[in-house]
């Protein structure tokens, strides 16, 4: 397929919707970094780098200047991506998903490498020809009249960067909104507020279309601060200090509230596999692909590259100059499924660790639990009895972090009764729930952590069954009616977080047990609504999943029937 068949903006909109759970509000952080740069950055060095980047040919000393300035910027910023190489294997993603990801990364690698070998002006493809061959080809092109003498620099023969180690160029380009805004303010002689207002309007336009140079010209009449943006088409590997339209659009995307802008995505190790899994789902739904044609990356290629560069940070807008390697270097797909040997039980004193989870999954659970903030209010709820729970959720309203998982019940008859009168979960939807997750989470909880619950008895029993008498519980003791004041609003706003409550819930015929609602009870959304009752309102902020969604269920074919 060719780039001409790519419906770019439709793909962008689909990616925004599909990855919306990981988009964040970054305006305050971006402006904090902007102020830090305005206070601490030497803009004489910035101007020097900008002049250098306008030259046709650059050498090692120029690269040193660019890298030194990038280091200075990185040291002043809070928003920066850290080197976090990711290793994906069967279990975190299915084998088919891993193969698809590996294939796309390889295609993207080939495309990027081809793009870097394409001539700067006439688009002549260099392939894997040596410099001697390229020079000779230029002479032949001149001989046959295709290329005029003296135009070698635009014919793709003379390199733009004449340096000893090309690998030092990696990750030294790409715009950073805080840098763009600070340069527009300082070098344009504008107030920070005027620059922010202009870029915000540009960002709002970006929610509906890709802004072009005509749009920029129109907006400039209202916002003179945008005059400093260069009236040039986007180029590959242009310096982040170049005030291009694409850099300004990226900055604008960070300054609007809403829109689920891809530029505001934040990645953490605990969410990485979930984001990749969701990306592949969106890709297949929209029939996206990696194009072999050299040139600018299409929306799918762009988000794939940025996500796979590092598993920690803001892929689009953070300072990334200190990351080594490229996306295909830093995200490694492993197909080796060799089993890890179980530890030998201790003979005298101490029992072997009994767990149904593989060590790598156990470690992922621990990292997810460690991401919780121990001093924040922490709601906890379960569905099902404490000795046979089918759903478990922890929710922290201040940070909007949550851990949520399911479990296949042992007592099927009792489960079906509870489904009918309470939680509405169907057996088929939890048939392949990964066993051992709830126990692993409880084992990993910090010592003496305090939880808040609506009804503490079942939670206390669950903790005690796991030997966690140290964990403390505060029971808010709301009435059934009080606890569900915000039920409809919570379900309307956050029902996408929980899709396993598909059954019909009916009122119990047992005397005195009529529920206050016939809506299904969800452990996660119950925690959200209980918290809303105490605070007096439902948050607009999207809760952030800490336990990767791909851990919740095992592949159906791996289910063992005894």
From Swiss-Prot:
Q: Where does Zn(2+) bind?
A: 391, 498, 501, 522
What main location does UniProt list? virion
Q: Name one GO biological process term.
A: negative stranded viral RNA replication
* Region described as Binding site for the cap structure m7GTP: spans on this chain: 53-238
Q: Where is the site described as Important for exonuclease activity found in this chain?
A: 458
Location comes to: Virion; Host cytoplasm
Q: Which UniProt keywords apply?
A: Capsid protein, Helical capsid protein, Host cytoplasm, Host-virus interaction, Hydrolase, Inhibition of host IKBKE by virus, Inhibition of host innate immune response by virus, Inhibition of host RLR pathway by virus, Interferon antiviral system evasion, Manganese, Metal-binding, Ribonucleoprotein, RNA-binding, Viral immunoevasion, Viral nucleoprotein, Virion, Zinc
- Provide the top EC class: hydrolase
Q: What protein name applies here?
A: Nucleoprotein
> Which gene is this protein's source?
N
